[in-house]
Amino acid sequence: MFEVKNSRGYIQGLFDSIIRKDIQQRFKIRYIESLRMLANHMIDNFGQEIIYSDLAERFGFGSSHTAENYVSYLKQTYLLLGIHKFSFKSKERIRNEKSYVVDTAFITERDDAMNGQNIGWKLENITYVELLRRNKPLFYDVFYYREQYEIDFVVCEGN
């Protein structure tokens, strides 16, 4: 392990590199500032259900399909992780996706960080990442289950 003297600068540099090199260059994104604002918004609002039409309207994308693509790019570069709601109905599983942040340092150490103080949300994020780390290699699926204000996770084997 090595010690980073300026953790905020390091994390911000990593974030900028993911946006510019891993996403903009790879996917030929023209509106980089919109992507950056979306990425910051998704990190600040981790653990919330994703509504692509709202994102498209908020960031001025031409369609919800564009917002969905941009969020997909953030997941493909491992900045965000997606999770679906547990339901026996496939339509509900697909429709109600949430996102979490791969590394909680992005929540607290970015220059535009807004949501670093809510310890409950950070613990929920850490719990999901750890469940995924432990169960994905075993081909288990992890879902979220919401009952009023409580968020629980469900781990399922196979289908």
What are these regions (language model features)?
Residues 2-158:
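Accessory nucleic acid-recognition modules appended to NTPase machines
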